Amino acid sequence: MKESILDVLLYLFEHYFSEDADLVRDHDSLQNGLIQAGFSPAEISKAFDWLDALSEQRPSVARPHVDGPVRIYHGPELDKLDVDCRGFLLFLEQHRILDADQRELVLDRAMALDQDELDLDDLKWVVLMVLFNQPGAEAAYAWMETQMFLDEPEPVH
C-alpha cells in the first residue's frame, strides 16, 4: 500500500488535476479512485486536508515582486529542508518565479507533509502544486512544469 501524503498528492496531480482542476471538489469520486489505486483512507483524508489548506491560503490579490530581506529558516524547517531545497527556493524567488507570499505558502505546505525530510524533487512537486493553485501564476507554473518534465530545462529569462 502507498502510504505518504505526498504520494497521494502526486497521484492526484498526475492523474486528475493536470486535466481538470475542478475535480478537486468531488472528494467522493476521487477518494474511490484513490482507494482503488491502493491508498489508505487515512492518507487520502490527510491529502484532502492538505489541499483544502492550500486553497484556503490562496492570496486574494497578486502583489508585485519586491526585493525584500533574505528568508531565515528555523529549526524544523532546517531539519526538513536541506541546503539544496533552501537554495532552490531562493533561486525561485530571485528569478521571480515565486514571490515572498508564495514562498511562505510553499514552506507551509512542505512543512505540513508527514515526512521528516524532503528532497529537492519532492519540494519541486510542492512548488508546482502551489503555483497550480495560484491565480495569476500561469507563467510561473508553466516554467516550473518545464523544469520538471523536460530533460534539458529552459533557462530563466
Swiss-Prot record:
- A Pfam family of the record is DUF494
Q: Which HAMAP family match?
A: Smg (MF_00598)
| Family label | Belongs to the Smg family.
Q: What is this protein called?
A: Protein Smg homolog
The source organism is Xanthomonas axonopodis pv. citri (strain 306)
